[in-house]
Amino acid sequence: MTIDSGFNHITVLLDEAVEALALRADGCYLDGTFGRGGHSRLILSKLGPQGRLLGFDKDPQAIATGQALAAEDGRFVIVQRSFAELGAEVAGRDLAGKVSGILLDLGVSSPQLDDPERGFSFLNDGPLDMRMNPNQGISAAEFIATAPVEEIARVFKEYGEERFAGRMARAVVERREKQPFTRTADLAEVLKVANPAWEKGKNPATRAFQGLRIHVNNELGDLETGLEAALDALEVGGRLAVISFHSLEDRIVKLFMRKLVKGEADNLPRNLPVQHKTFEPRIKLIGKAQFASEAELKANPRSRSAVMRVAEKLR
């Protein structure tokens, strides 16, 4: 467990993820989602003097934590970028095709969820923001204030998998014409009233809030870009471990890995004039999808939706 600004964060699948990277003492590794540094600290504890670790994060608070770690350990460097940009960062450091392992721990962290001022939570009132980097892009409030009802409904449905997306979007637009949304609790209440069928044990605003967060931070687009960049950055034999927390993320990871296991030309007719190498696998899967243990679920209920997939680069 790491503690930041009074908010507890328990790293999910900590030992399993680091073990999946098959660390070499002198290897070069990337933590694409530094967060509060749980995975990074464990990786560093297993690297030798020649080992290196490069961390990425968009969140200013995560960067501050990372800079403190970098000051303590010269083997570690933190950069304030999305892991979707790791290709450019790796190229600039002459590490393309030389990275031994990459870890991506997707989604929002507990400190982000639990800090009302970040605007991620429908349980604790705060400014309606939701940006991983509050200094970049438009906030959730700005999106809600200007987007057409069809676009809001699309975000709720496509990214939040909300059954009543249209109805909830119309309620949002109707209310914003009278008074703009600036607070999370205000939006959550309107969504709650507009949702006609509450799921047992789940806040009726959950899916819509997820959709907003994913849209505001371009999470799925970043994931698709980041996976491609990660594969290019890895050396042959390098490992990629990805932890996802909802079906949309996991579907992207699963399809990406499946495509590369079968060969990139898997969907092409076999009589097309393409090189045989195009059909050869680029990765192999390491084991099956992993989930949190019973012990971890008891210690950290938020780990219940975590799933980790691991692949090794073949060429």
From Swiss-Prot:
Reactions mediated catalytically: cytidine(1402) in 16S rRNA + S-adenosyl-L-methionine = N(4)-methylcytidine(1402) in 16S rRNA + S-adenosyl-L-homocysteine + H(+)
Subcellular location as annotated: Cytoplasm
Binding site for S-adenosyl-L-methionine: 37-39, 57, 83, 105, 112
Entry GO CC: cytoplasm
GO BP annotations listed: rRNA base methylation
Gene Ontology molecular function terms on file: rRNA (cytosine-N4-)-methyltransferase activity
EC class of the enzyme, as a word: transferase
EC number, as in UniProt: 2.1.1.199
Keyword set, alphabetical order: Cytoplasm, Methyltransferase, rRNA processing, S-adenosyl-L-methionine, Transferase
SUPFAM superfamilies: Putative methyltransferase TM0872, insert domain (SSF81799), S-adenosyl-L-methionine-dependent methyltransferases (SSF53335)
Principal subcellular localisation of the protein: cytoplasm
Pfam (any one): Methyltransf_5
Role of this protein: Specifically methylates the N4 position of cytidine in position 1402 (C1402) of 16S rRNA.
Entry's family note: Belongs to the methyltransferase superfamily. RsmH family.
HAMAP family assigned: 16SrRNA_methyltr_H
Name assigned to this protein: Ribosomal RNA small subunit methyltransferase H
Lineage of producing organism: Bacteria, Pseudomonadati, Pseudomonadota, Gammaproteobacteria, Pseudomonadales
